């Protein structure tokens, strides 16, 4: 059996800690035979555990403590600490592992609830489970979210080789915003959501780049954001915004300029991968 979970990009600018989009990069987990102890075979490095302390197995055992150990093989296109939902993908993979081996028959709604409980909010985990674009909120311990089709466009991910921990990126955020600024920030997010629902990527893109919640504070940690925006706009892109906490920048563009824009971004003197991606519509899947 094989479990596949997509990468996700949270925020989309002003949709801070609420919006998330599934992307065509994947964490893939092949379930092998039973074993005496849990073991995840992978060549990712970075201190990611091979035993039951791995987040995937920890999550699975949290849901089904009596699971029989298995040999697992993990491959992952999602680079860690880049703002592409790698930790959320691992949590969702663990939920799918428990659901498959223990035959829990969890609904998608239950999977989102469990994952959001573990991660703290649904902005990454909901699109990882459901696919496409999700707007959500966690209120008084309850998850509220809406899945909707995102407008058709090209996605270009500018992924620096240097990682940025979410804890570091959150550390630069203020404890509070002045009331008038919060009202303006909220109105920008509202217009972005409405524009996306109307398939108006031109207006949505303008709002994406006017975020007041987090990007201006995080820009000191992601100095390449301004440079990428300038290149993207000069080529006709809709917008460029931080993916999650960064340092990845996600560019939204008309499909007919995607290859040209990708080539232009590859010429920047920043050590990074520049990937042409699509919106992932299915979310987490299990293949038998």
Swiss-Prot record:
It is found in: Cytoplasm. GO terms for cellular component: cytoplasm. Its EC number is 2.7.1.39. The keyword Nucleotide-binding applies. GO terms for molecular function: ATP binding; homoserine kinase activity. Keywords: Amino-acid biosynthesis, ATP-binding, Cytoplasm, Kinase, Nucleotide-binding, Threonine biosynthesis, Transferase. PROSITE patterns: GHMP_KINASES_ATP (PS00627). Pathway: Amino-acid biosynthesis; L-threonine biosynthesis; L-threonine from L-aspartate: step 4/5. Pfam families: GHMP_kinases_C, GHMP_kinases_N. ATP binds at residues 79-89. It catalyses: L-homoserine + ATP = O-phospho-L-homoserine + ADP + H(+). GO terms for biological process: threonine biosynthetic process. Catalyzes the ATP-dependent phosphorylation of L-homoserine to L-homoserine phosphate. NCBIfam families: thrB. Belongs to the GHMP kinase family. Homoserine kinase subfamily. This is Homoserine kinase. It comes from Listeria welshimeri serovar 6b (strain ATCC 35897 / DSM 20650 / CCUG 15529 / CIP 8149 / NCTC 11857 / SLCC 5334 / V8).
């Amino acid at each position: 059996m094989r479990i596949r979970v997509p990468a996700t990009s949270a925020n989309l600018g002003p949709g801070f800690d609420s919006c998330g989009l599934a992307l065509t990069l994947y964490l893939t987990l092949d379930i092998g035979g039973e074993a005496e102890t849990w073991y995840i075979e992978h060549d990712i490095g970075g201190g990611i555990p091979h035993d039951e302390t791995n987040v995937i197995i920890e999550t699975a055992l949290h849901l089904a403590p009596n699971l029989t150990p298995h040999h697992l093989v993990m491959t992952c296109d999602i680079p860690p600490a880049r703002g592409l939902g790698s930790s959320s993908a691992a949590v969702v993979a663990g939920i799918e592992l428990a659901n498959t081996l223990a035959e829990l028959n969890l609904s998608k709604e239950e999977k989102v609830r469990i994952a959001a409980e573990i991660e703290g909010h649904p902005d990454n985990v909901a699109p990882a489970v459901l696919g496409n674009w999700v707007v959500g909120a966690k209120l008084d311990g309850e998850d509220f979210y809406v899945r909707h089709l995102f407008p058709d466009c090209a996605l270009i991910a500018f992924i620096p080789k240097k990682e940025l921990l979410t804890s570091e990126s959150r550390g630069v955020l203020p404890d509070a915003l002045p009331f008038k600024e919060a009202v303006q920030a909220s109105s920008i997010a509202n217009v972005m959501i409405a524009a996306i629902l109307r398939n108006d990527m031109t207006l949505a893109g303008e709002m994406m780049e006017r975020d007041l919640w987090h990007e201006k504070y995080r820009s000191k940690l992601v100095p390449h954001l301004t440079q990428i925006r300038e290149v993207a706009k000069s080529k006709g892109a809709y917008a460029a915004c931080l993916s999650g906490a960064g340092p990845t920048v996600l560019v939204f563009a008309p499909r007919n300029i995607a290859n040209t824009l990708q080539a232009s971004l590859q010429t920047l003197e920043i050590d990074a991968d520049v990937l042409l991606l699509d919106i992932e519509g299915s979310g987490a899947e299990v293949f038998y």
